[in-house]
């Protein structure tokens, strides 16, 4: 998919790089081959990368909802990448989805230009265009700024690590599928080497590249879920380990997994912080080639539609990525469910109380884990951290009257 399609058709013209910002976005409804009709948003920003923006807006959206940015692979379109299952999951779990789309004028095979310095630098090119799409969503919908995530396949996966490194202040989580580390390549020639056999650097060297994406930044960094097929002959599986090395070092943790298990029969590893917060995870899909793993069906953990580079392997990557982000289920924390006089504690789920009270859900975790799971924003994180301590386990309560979480059972704001 990627190796034969990475060549750029033409370098951008100065005119395209300096496209104008219009006062109001133009909205166009399109369907194409989309499972759900996507809406195109034009004039969403200065758009220096000359990308197109499509969005999926589920019905009945609550205030302060999450946002997922999903980046297609080479030769694909926004509509085609809906087959990954994100729109359907957004309908069920109530989050918005933005699908950036490459144009052939930028790259003849519609690959995001993850190897071009002018497109992978903060404040420039395609990276800035994608960030402006997020800004547009925040301006026009009720988006929780602490629950914005990015994922992608192949060239879109490489661009995913670009966004994680250059905009850690925007994205709370990232999930590259069949991609590699940030700045694995900075030219078309080096891109081929990066893809296969791959580039070997020390964790510290990779981490320095990621930190250089936004020099001097000291805020929360995005957690990352890294997926790869063991039989991927387009982007070598070695890239998965290099990405682990980059982002574990970026987070200041070691490269020894704290959890090694299987999910759906496939190897899964988790790398945690000193206080037990999952920061990096990997899924290695044994025997899978180059593509996004899906599991078509109607089960709670099933999603996606098989197609070109959308591979039915009986595990839906989008579902498990959503769990890791904390926008599907409990994001790996502990939840207490009360029904009558019976209290049950379970992991990785968020459940509803049946008692008559102002709140409808309660879950206990450290203040840091509440933030990682997306229940509180940065301001609330700092308030609660100062109030209780960042590694202190506290209950939070979901209150419909607040359309969000609070530390007070009477539903007073944080």
From Swiss-Prot:
Its main location: secreted. Residues 1-37 form the signal peptide. One of its GO terms (molecular function) is hydrolase activity. GO terms for cellular component: extracellular region. The active site is at 154 (charge relay system). The keyword Acetylation does not apply. InterPro entries: AB_hydrolase_fold, Esterase_phb, Plant_Biomass_Hydrol_Est. Keywords: Hydrolase, Lipid degradation, Lipid metabolism, Secreted, Signal. GO terms for biological process: lipid catabolic process. Pfam families: Esterase_PHB (PF10503). Its EC number is 3.1.1.-. It is found in: Secreted. The keyword Signal applies. Specific for poly(hydroxyalkanoic acid) consisting of monomers of four or five carbon atoms and for P-nitrophenylbutyrate as substrates. Belongs to the AB hydrolase superfamily. Lipase family. This is Poly(3-hydroxyalkanoate) depolymerase C. The lineage of its organism: Bacteria, Pseudomonadati, Pseudomonadota, Betaproteobacteria, Burkholderiales.
């Amino acid at each position: 998919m990627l190796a034969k399609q990475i060549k750029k058709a033409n370098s951008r013209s100065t005119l395209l790089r300096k496209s104008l910002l219009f006062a109001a976005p133009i909205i166009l409804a399109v369907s194409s081959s989309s499972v759900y009709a996507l809406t195109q948003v034009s004039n969403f920003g200065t758009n220096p990368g000359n990308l197109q923006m499509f969005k999926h807006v589920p019905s009945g959206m609550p205030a302060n909802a999450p946002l997922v940015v999903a980046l297609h692979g080479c030769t694909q379109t926004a509509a085609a990448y809906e087959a990954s299952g994100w729109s359907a999951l957004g309908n069920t779990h109530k989050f918005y989805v933005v699908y950036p789309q490459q144009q052939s004028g930028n790259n003849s095979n519609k690959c995001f230009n993850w190897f071009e310095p002018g497109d992978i630098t903060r404040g420039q090119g395609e990276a800035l265009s994608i960030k402006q799409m997020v800004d547009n969503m925040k301006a026009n919908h009720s988006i929780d700024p602490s629950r914005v995530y990015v994922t992608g396949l192949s060239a879109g996966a490489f661009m995913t690590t670009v966004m994680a490194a250059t905009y850690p202040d925007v994205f709370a989580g990232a999930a590259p599928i069949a991609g590699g580390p940030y700045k694995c390549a900075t030219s078309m020639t080096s891109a081929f080497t990066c893809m296969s056999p791959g580039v070997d650097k020390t964790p510290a060297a990779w981490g320095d590249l990621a930190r250089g994406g936004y020099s001097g930044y000291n805020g929360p960094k995005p957690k990352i879920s890294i997926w790869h097929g063991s039989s991927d002959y387009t982007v070598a599986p070695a890239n998965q380990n290099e990405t682990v090395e980059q982002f574990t070092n970026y987070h200041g943790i070691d490269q020894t997994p704290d959890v090694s298990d299987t999910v759906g029969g496939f190897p899964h590893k988790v790398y945690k912080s000193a206080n037990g917060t999952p920061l990096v995870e990997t899924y290695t899909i044994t025997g899978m080639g180059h593509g996004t793993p899906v599991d078509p069906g109607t089960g709670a953990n099933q999603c996606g539609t098989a197609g070109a580079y959308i591979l039915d392997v009986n595990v839906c990557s989008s579902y498990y990525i959503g769990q890791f982000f904390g926008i599907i289920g409990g994001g790996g924390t502990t939840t207490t469910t009360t029904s009558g006089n019976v209290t049950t504690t379970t992991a990785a789920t968020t459940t509803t109380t049946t008692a008559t009270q102002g709140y409808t859900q309660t879950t206990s975790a450290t203040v840091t884990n509440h933030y990682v799971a997306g229940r509180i924003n940065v301001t609330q994180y700092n308030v609660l951290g100062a109030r209780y301590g960042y590694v202190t386990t506290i209950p939070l309560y979901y209150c419909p009257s607040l359309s969000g979480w609070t530390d007070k059972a009477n539903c007073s704001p944080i």
